[in-house]
Amino acid sequence: SETAQSSGVGFAVPVDLVKRVVPSLIENGKYIYPLMGISGNEVELTLRENVGLPSDLVGAYVTRVTPDGPADLAGIQGDTGTQFSDLNFDGDVIISINNVQMESMDDLVGYLALNTSPGENITVGIFRNKSEVTVSMTLGFRPPTN
């Protein structure tokens, strides 16, 4: 920029995402992202200690589930706390999608964007009550932002 305020700032977009999104943008003027209908966080030490999770468990901790959304309809459970700062540590941990391990919330979001489409059926591996459970889910679509 002329003021050099953005000097040195760069962004990287994975080429696989570009190959997936650009044709839809050209053809339709938009791209519709898949949606699970959850909010989540990383599996951190505090969560492991409060719930007694295995020390090597990784995944995406489900803090909220959108009512009547894909995850809710599939039976995925979010934390019952009313605020992020008031978690009860009783939500599910998503550990895999379609047998691909999810090590973080970023992994989950990236996997959905690069490998799935709205309306697609996926298999979700979750850790709940000290055991692994698998559920099937049909992905929704993320509403466009204006």
Q: Model-derived features: where do they sit?
A:
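Active-site proximal helix/loop that lines the substrate pocket
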Residues: 1-2, 47
